[in-house]
Amino acid sequence: MTAYIWQESWDRQQTAFMPDREERFAAMLTAVDAITDGRPPRVLDLAGGPGTIALRTLARFPGAEVTLLDQDPVLLAIAGATLAGRATIVDADLGDPAWRAKLPTDGFDAVLTATALHWLPAERVATLYGEIREALRPGGIFVNADHMPEESLPTLSERLRDRGRELREARYASGAATSWDEWWQRVAADEHLAPKAVERERIYPTATHHQEWTPPALWHVDALRVAGYTEAGVLWRGGTDAAVVGLR
């Protein structure tokens, strides 16, 4: 399959998890537009995977200066092929405090990330928020969209998760969507991506993969304030997911 077909299959697989996926991206980019007054923004797609946010940024802001940072060899290969000549691709580990040294520039108008940082330990996320702040220009924004249940609605949040799982399994059963595991099995069977999948397993051994960690949005807002952002709050919410924003 070509890189563009892999992009499309990634989108379908992810949309099965998050039917309102595009809404969070639209909210992010609307915030970017608001703080750049119509000029082309400088954006960092953090833990950007195959380039989901980067592609949407370039579609909305054709003159944008985009950098994508990730560590996954498979997703970086897809991103590199589909974003060639349109974005700077950076291979870096967000678990390493020196990750910013690999960036081609700083002073970003926006650092955007989605459904990625929940794989990091809590203490690392809190520290990372401060490091991200240093990559922003004064007045720039950081937006993190992820699984962030509303802690004051535990019963409804649980039911929303359960119902989402039921609908997702129905999509898998009907063949309308590919599951996470099936998508990666297809990667491993692809002649071009299989070597990258082997490399990926060395970086993220299945047996030692850190468990997902999904605190409520308020935890993230508090962490942003502690990290020195002048303003922090919830930008968007959809069910048990939310996007928090911090303003430098």
Give the location of each predicted region:
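Conserved class I S-adenosyl-L-methionine
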Residues: 1-38, 52-56, 143-172, 176-179
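Class I SAM-dependent methyltransferase SAM/SAH-binding core
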Residues: 44, 51-99
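A conserved beta-strand element that flanks and buttresses the S-adenosyl-L-methionine
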Residues: 112
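Short alpha-helix
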Residues: 212-227
